[in-house]
């Protein structure tokens, strides 16, 4: 074992070397070999990788026992040279120190800049992988196959091109999928995956932990330990899991597939922003996985940002016992116009928009409210309720079973006239001084008070 005194610069061997600097301005050169570890300490250091291997560069001060502590105050220059799997490791940094780096943002000499919250910067080149510290780091990859690890803290991690490993670690992280085939692991706490960069429709399911083809130019990703999803500006299909999820569709006509848990669905709106739902938006939630659901889109609550949302009550009972008990969870629906029910006794109520409400199997109650609605009963003995004489020109299909349209809420001056047609043939319901409906597969009619 050699002791080096008053030495600032070291060149390694052809083996896998471990080279640590001191408080001086060091030049540490791995030279040759695979698996070298170079540690810059207190000075403005130059760390050079080997010519024929993959090396690890660590930021921090080396203690006498070989461990690292936070405190590398230098402005370092780090070049991985010829390796294709070099790693820059900031895991020694404590929570009060953060890093920010965009590996694809190069200066005129081909270097990327790591900006550190203490005011120092590192210039890096030929680095493929970065490990963050305990702070809230921002790590953006490049066109290569990157491994980006946030560590502790609420990190932002962005994959670009290449087949990447994007790992959040502890903290509430936001991970952006890239265009390659990425492995995305949120780690601990409440994490979000974003597909905002997609160029087309995406389909993502948090219940699928194996590789899934996302679409929209985003490759085939493996997603695990993720609670929340941000979609694209296109027509997305997003499914949660059994946890508490927040699913954000963004622009486009999005479909959310509901699962267990008290979830929040944002159609055409980003969380924390203000948005007014416009007629013509066609965001939907699919409750076909639920035991039973009650949704009233016309009943809303206003959040702190001024956005209105409706609630969906999900029951753990599939019997016709109402919704006063056996409520498993409650979802919050932002910007949702269309609902698909479960296979049992659902109640689906629309709003002033042109809604599509699908009862599916079971004896369902469907009420369109305003707008030109499409109401489909599916299997079972369904009831369709007209709210008023001017509640829109609705299209109603009872489906199979013994189905009823109910106009009893209309006033005495709003008589209806209908002759029921054969199965699968539409008949017109004429409403005096009101909006006419077209209906098919209806067996029973309840008239108005007129």
Model-derived segments and spans:
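GD-rich hexapeptide-repeat beta-solenoids
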Residues: 1, 26, 52, 60-62, ...
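Short, intrinsically disordered, charge-balanced linker/junction segments flanking boundaries
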Residues: 1, 77, 138, 347, ...
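Short loop/turn positions that demarcate and connect the beta-strands within blades
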Residues: 4, 121-124, 220-223, 330-333, ...
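Glycine-centered beta-turn/loop sites at beta-strand termini
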Residues: 12, 20-21, 30-32, 39-42, ...
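Extracellular acidic loop/turn motifs
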Residues: 13-15, 120, 133-135, 232-235, ...
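Thr-biased low-complexity repeat/linker tracts and other Thr-enriched repetitive architectures
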Residues: 172, 381, 400, 438, ...
